[in-house]
Amino acid sequence: MPQTTPPLDRATLGLVTLFLTSGATHLVRPQVFEGMVPHVLPRRRELVHASGVAEIACALGLLHPRTRRAAGLASAALLVAVFPANVQMSASHAKRARRRGDVGSQAFFAGTVARLPMQWPLIRTALRAAGRL
């Protein structure tokens, strides 16, 4: 018996919007994201561009019922794959906040730390779109 395609709900539309916005920014202003790429990885600019294209592809795939399941799985995988970049961003901003000691740097660092657990609800949304939850 074929499975029905999960509906395009608000959470999935939110993920689509997030991916489209972030993906476009990756392509237009890659320098914003290059510092997030873990230092052990080469060719940062190319990785930023590739992740932007992947985000846009996932977003578009989530919109269409025929591709939603595959795009949901790809979206979850992408969110897991970029998690080290989010950790790298927090680590970099922790150093900057300690070095500068100003409120703005400390607040930005706090935001990067708060962002880390927010990745899990996004992954859950992607898996729901794939019909896996």
Task: Locate predicted features.
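Short amphipathic, positively biased membrane-proximal segments
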Residues: 1-133
